[in-house]
Swiss-Prot record:
GO MF annotation terms: protein histidine phosphatase activity
Similarity field: Belongs to the SixA phosphatase family.
Record's protein name: Uncharacterized protein SYNPCC7002_A2622
Keyword check for Ribonucleoprotein: no
Lineage, uppermost ranks: Bacteria, Bacillati, Cyanobacteriota, Cyanophyceae, Oscillatoriophycideae
Keyword DNA-binding: no
Stored SMART domains: PGAM (SM00855)
Length: 165
């Protein structure tokens, strides 16, 4: 199984919105995210599932990935909201055990995505994986089931600047 962590694109300033969850992508954020998604599609990446945080900027990012034909319509997962639960996600992930070759992408927020990737790849977190906006981390598991620090490999960590034309 391959598990990708995709941080939402550049969002509007917090000061302009009463609720953090209402902040949309900026025009620049939308444009950059579309370019990154197009590049991932050109590289032949395709996800069997797109899971997104309920916050607007993450949902918009997930929709961009789906529109670029990288995967199906996104599914909202409350556990991907800021300060979400890795345990709840791993429990949800069990439904994919029958599809060991699946590629799934999680669209969410920092520092959570970086911490989750660290916990799964290394068994601990140390705030070392800095995921830029519209950046992506890829983990591969040799096991039928992804668990924290069990035969998992970090194979991709890239900033959007390396994917933009």
């Amino acid at each position: 199984m391959e598990l990708y962590f995709f941080r939402h694109g550049i969002a509007a300033d917090r000061a302009d919105y009463a609720e953090d969850g209402d902040r949309p992508l900026t025009t620049k954020g939308e444009t950059r995210t579309k370019l990154v998604a197009q590049r991932l599609q050109q590289l032949g990446l395709h996800f069997e599932g797109i899971l997104t945080s309920p916050l607007l900027r993450a949902r918009q990012t997930a929709e961009i990935l789906a529109a670029a034909e990288l995967g199906p319509h996104p599914q909202v997962f409350q556990g991907l909201a800021p300060r979400g639960s890795l345990g709840a996600f791993l429990a949800w992930l069990e439904r994919w055990e029958a599809a060991p070759d699946a590629k799934l992408v999680l669209v969410g927020h920092q520092p959570d995505l970086g911490e989750w990737a660290e916990a799964i790849a290394f068994g601990q977190t140390g705030h070392h994986l800095n995921l830029k906006k519209a950046g992506i981390i890829g983990l591969r598991s040799g096991a039928a089931r992804i668990q924290a620090h069990t035969d998992n490999e970090l194979f991709l960590l890239t900033s959007p600047k390396w994917l933009l034309p």
